Amino acid sequence: MTGLLFFLGAAASAVCDDPQTQTDMTICAGKDYAAADEELNAQWAITAKHMKEYDNTLDRSHDTRPGYFETLLKAQRAWLSYRDAHCTSAGYYARGGSLEPLLVSSCKAELTRERTAQLRELAETN
């Protein structure tokens, strides 16, 4: 059974090197988004840790505003809502058709990679 699963995974990976059908393209777009999301989650952990550490270095005894991490978390939650709504809207170009999931996944992958770069830059410049 394990050998079959490995074979199927390898076959799916090979398909994404040169997808030929709409189904293949949709599957590959989903995998691309999943990979981008994994990268985002890894970068989020790095950036969040950095911002928490930065917050701890500040004297906020006279400052009641939220800290760096708290505002970043709020922004990230808003960004996730934006990304999902925006990409759902982008998919409506082919609403109900077989192209819709490909458009949504491709949009999510693109925006997720852009956000990952933003988070990386935040961690590197602060």
Where are these regions (language model features)?
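N-terminal alpha-helical modules
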Residues: 11-126
